[in-house]
Swiss-Prot record:
Alphabetized PROSITE patterns for the sequence: KH_TYPE_1, S1
Span of domain S1 motif: 63-131
Similarity comment: Belongs to the RRP4 family.
Subunit composition and interactions: Component of the archaeal exosome complex. Forms a trimer of Rrp4 and/or Csl4 subunits. The trimer associates with a hexameric ring-like arrangement composed of 3 Rrp41-Rrp42 heterodimers.
InterPro entries reported in the protein's UniProt record: Exosome_RNA_bind1/RRP40/RRP4, KH_dom, KH_dom_type_1, KH_dom_type_1_sf, NA-bd_OB-fold, Rrp4, RRP4_N, RRP4_S1
Keyword Transmembrane helix attached: no
Domain KH: 139-200
Subcellular location, record wording: Cytoplasm
Protein name (database record): Exosome complex component Rrp4
Length: 222
């Protein structure tokens, strides 16, 4: 007997299935029942059930800004990797330049895009759209990756951290709430920003972080 569905999000101790199923990774058995041992996403393959951990993964929400890479081009849509367990699509109907017949003339595989989540349906399929104004396709620069839950720390109180990063390095910086950050500027400065972001990700729980990051950047520039 199953107590959950494919792609359900579960928490530790949540009952998943009876003993007619095989316990996979991220699960444990107690009194002939299978339970989740982690926060994660249910995966059912035949009679095997497992839970894919979601730690560090991005759970999409409507109106979030995200940075993603085009991984496939299908009929009337692009498939975009947004660092989430859930698939994300950008329909051609959301794109301004509808006159082009070949979708790859607009966005091709490997292109990095700055997008907005328009909708997340009941089975967690993600529909993407464009921001009003601002860049869509991100040219050049480099990408940094942090834990999605640490993005507010990169912004800082009243934007203090992100303003400081931009001012000291003279880099363009765009934040995706999925933990993907685009940085464009002098190559040395791009690398300094990436290392500063790693520091923020690692030390987000500590106090006085903005001052320490500032000191690190100044030392690195000198």
């Amino acid at each position: 007997m199953l107590f959950v569905k494919e792609r359900d999000i579960v928490v530790p101790g949540e009952k998943l299935a009876g003993n007619d199923y095989i316990a996979g990774r991220g699960t444990f058995i107690e009194e002939d029942k299978i339970y989740s041992s982690v926060v994660g996403l249910v995966s059912i393959k035949g009679k095997r059930i497992e839970v894919i951990p979601l730690q560090g993964k991005y759970i999409p929400k409507k109106n979030d800004s995200v940075i993603g890479k085009v991984v496939d081009v299908k009929f009337a849509r692009w498939i975009v990797d947004i660092r989430s367990p859930y698939s994300a699509i950008l329909p051609v109907s959301e794109v301004i330049d509808k006159g082009k017949k070949n979708l790859e003339e607009i966005f091709g595989i490997g292109d990095t895009l700055f997008l907005k989540i328009i909708e997340v349906d009941e089975v967690k399929k993600v529909k993407l759209g464009l921001h009003e104004g601002g860049p869509i396709k991100l040219e050049g620069g480099t990408l940094a990756y942090i834990t999605p839950s640490k993005v507010p720390r990169v912004i800082g109180r009243k934007g203090s951290m992100i303003k400081m990063l931009k001012k000291l390095t003279n880099c363009e910086i765009l934040l995706g709430q999925n933990g993907v950050i685009w940085v464009k500027g002098d190559k040395k400065m791009e690398e300094i920003v990436k290392r500063a972001l790693e520091m923020i990700d690692r030390e987000a729980h500590t106090s006085g972080l903005t001052d320490r990051v500032k000191e690190f950047i100044i030392r690195s520039i000198e």
